[in-house]
Amino acid sequence: MSRFTSATHGLNLSIKMPISVSQVPSIRSNTSKYELQKLRSTGRSVLQTRRQLAIINMTKRSEADDNDGVERRKGVFHPNLWDDGFIQSLSTVYHEQASYRERAERLIGEVKAVFDSISMGDGDQFISPSAYDTAWVARVPAIDGSSRPQFPQAIDWILLNQQQDGSWGSQSHLSLTHRLTDTLACVIALASWKIESVQIDEGLDFITRGVEKLQSESVPAEFEIIFAELLNQAKSLQLSLPYEHSCLQSLWRKQEPILANGLMDSVAKRSLSSLEEMQDHRMNTDSDGTMHVESFLSSPAVAARVLMRTGNPICLAYLNNVLNKFGDYVPGMYPVDLFQRLWMVDNVERLGIDRHFKKEIQVTLDYVYSYWNGKGIGCGRDSLSPDLNSTSLGFRTLRLHGYNVSADVLEHFKDRDGKFVCSSNPTVGEIRSVLNLYRASLLAFPGEKVMEEAETFARRYLEEIVQKIPPSKFSREIEYVLEFGWQSTVPRWEARSYIDFHGLDTYSPWTIYEMASEKFLELAKLEFNIFNSLQHTELQYLSRWWNDSGMSQMRFTRHRNVEYYTMASCIAMEPSQSAFRIGFTKLCGIATCIDDIYDTYGTIDELKLFREAVKRWDPSAIESLPEYMKSVYMVLYELVNEMAQDTERTQGRDTLDYARNAWEAIIDAHLVEAEWIASGHIPTFEEYLENSKVTSGLHIAILPILTLDVPLPDQLPLQEIDTLSRFHHLASTIGRLSGDMNAYKIDLAHGEESSCISCYMKDNPGTTEGDAHNYANVTISYLMKELNLELMGQHNRVSFLRTSKKPAFDIYRASNYMYKYRDGYTIADKETKNLVMRTLVQAVSL
């Protein structure tokens, strides 16, 4: 057992010595008798006393080194933001109180039951009623020509489901526009059949009050179209509403240009959820007037409108089928068995609770894939036409899980000119479809031109649309996806963000999964907070370890253990992955110290001595080192040995030589960069990248992956996961290019002239810093596609590689986040601080 207790042995903080007394640095004469007596009086053993004295001597030497006459460069960074007192004070109740865990376990069981019901074909019970669609169905007259409703049960549902405030619709929807639309549709349905009911008056009163409030709200174009047309119908029925109100007059004025712009004309195969509100001449028809019934066989409201106009028997059969399923109401969409499954998987993954449902996710995606075809999918297996939303979400989810899906499926959503197009006044359905198209496009493989076209189109569309729609959870979700995409986010950060804007689209005219959505969100919040308690415990241990090791006394280096632990816990969110989180944090902490020694603090002679000590791998090697390096060397030595023991317990294989080789490689590469700095040499771009792939540290950061409970096959050489593998080559190169672009000016300020920017400009005389940035961005874009292929392609031979690449990719993504705006390791008091606060310090409100 090493002196710092193994991460896989809980958080026992006892300190033991792995080396003999003769190997402990001797007590220097500059240790006072008072200090010696004070240490001995605490009852420590001789070995513990000697170690503490070594730390005291190291501290004194570190202070003396500042005035030792050696010219030393200093890094440009701010002090540690999180002192030990603050860390030790962190506390929550969620891990301690069993009631939270018990509630979470019940919710896990309930969500599993939802998955199971859906897989058995009984998922309709989780689809919520749509007051809006039910109102349209209630208006359909009997097909036999009698003066009665064809679907009287829909009238009964309206009469039985008015809210106390006079409105109709889901009470969970806070959007006023949503409630107004539902209520007016239901009032019109009742009035159409001349039903004498106080409920009509109560509904009209709610609308009148709502119109007054509407003046202070920003409303979407979708509402303007739908509500204005409903107002026309209400006026024809002589319903008492404030038609002269300025707000309603404004809606009417806006309606005509919106319709004149051809809302439905230019969009290929898009959602038709608002078609029922268009004027008759805007119905989806061919030039000869033939109507496309298949376009609206997933929308009860559209089917009802067409049935009223045409008596189409397919629409009648469709509505009969839906009401047979749900009784006296209809949902906003049906059938949705494919989209429902994709929605389930997408939500549990984005909320960070997917680890509980791995089996269910596999079964669910196998079902979706069985209906996948070259043109994509619709909402349901019986959909006659694919839609962009279901296809985009399906493509993204299936590719992420390793299914063989071709990007060519997106070609079917272009217009005749081969372009993705949109309407001038889009609906929520269209925006959601384009958002999922953008998310899918970020998983492009090399050579997939349609994915590049989709990304360009969707990004431009979303950037414009987010400026137009009202602030809402949906708009914040769009902003998040645009800002972080796929390569610059990590699971816990995404979960924390998605908890904030998870829910029903705030102004969509229908909802389908209200009950399941509430369960998902409650479970996600509980899981987030329970894990938050474990984070505090682990971080408190790590803070004590850092202090006990003497590393906290090093003034020349960045102290970023809280930030590194935050990254680790954003990547590995399972409680059982403690060894990974702790090992990752320790390794990154010592790697940063060594990086700062080689980048700024050490002399070339000292750096060579440290390299030789690492190659010897013997505690006695510290005698040749400067005082400030001794403690660093011993922490490195013991940590690497400790983690090799952890890995051997997990994998049953000795990985010490592999870990030592990884450290020797990074220190050799650090020395090369130090010599470049000392001599003022600027290498070629290729030479720089080749060396910096190693100094990026990815092959060090991934070592804790070996502690995960993923068996390493006996026949798999360790070199398969080494820095020479293609996956790590790509990730390291992208990481270095991304980091250099944001750290270039800071590095230049403290003497590091070698970076991808300066090397490119040297190789290409006459080019500017902007040219170098453009070249780096183009290179990153290409390499990201290669990296996607490595992660999600069909060629991975060994299950360990497929499984281990995901956390390795998440480490790369975490690094991308840290360098997204600036060097987030050096300047950690801005975006990095926000990451720490939101994913580690603060719990979420239940």
UniProtKB/Swiss-Prot annotation:
InterPro entries xref list: Isoprenoid_synthase_dom_sf, Terpene_cyclase-like_1_C, Terpene_cyclase_plant_C1, Terpene_synth_N, Terpene_synth_N_sf, Terpene_synthase-like, Terpene_synthase_metal-bd, Terpenoid_cyclase/PrenylTrfase
Q: Which CDD domains match?
A: Terpene_cyclase_plant_C1
**Changing residue 564 to F: reported impact?**
No effect on catalytic activity
Q: What gene is it encoded by?
A: TPS8
Q: Does the keyword Iron apply?
A: no
Record-listed E.C. numbers: 4.2.3.180
- Names of the cofactor(s): Mg(2+)
The alphabetical list of record keywords is:
Chloroplast, Lyase, Magnesium, Metal-binding, Plastid, Transit peptide
Q: List the disulfide bonds.
A: none
Q: Where is this motif: DDXXD motif?
A: 595-599
Q: What does this protein do?
A: Converts geranylgeranyl diphosphate to an new 5,7-fused bicyclic diterpene, named pseudolaratriene. Catalyzes the first committed step in pseudolaric acid B (PAB) biosynthesis. PAB exhibits antiproliferative activity by inhibiting microtubule polymerization, and has demonstrated antitumor properties against several cancer types.
> Example GO biological process term?
diterpenoid biosynthetic process
Q: Which superkingdom?
A: Eukaryota
Q: What does changing residue 735 to D/N/W do?
A: Abolishes catalytic activity
Which residues are Mg(2+) 3-binding?
Answer: 747
**Known catalytic reactions:** (2E,6E,10E)-geranylgeranyl diphosphate = pseudolaratriene + diphosphate
GO molecular function term, any single one = magnesium ion binding
Q: What is the lineage of its organism?
A: Eukaryota, Viridiplantae, Streptophyta, Embryophyta, Tracheophyta
- Binding of Mg(2+) 2 occurs at 595, 599
Result of altering residue 564 to H:
Slightly reduces catalytic activity
Q: Which residues does Mg(2+) 1 bind?
A: 595, 599
The reply on keyword Endoplasmic reticulum is no
Entry's family note: Belongs to the terpene synthase family.
This one is known as: Pseudolaratriene synthase, chloroplastic
Which residues constitute the organelle targeting sequence?
Answer: 1-58
Relate the outcome reported for changing residue 743 to T: Strongly reduces catalytic activity
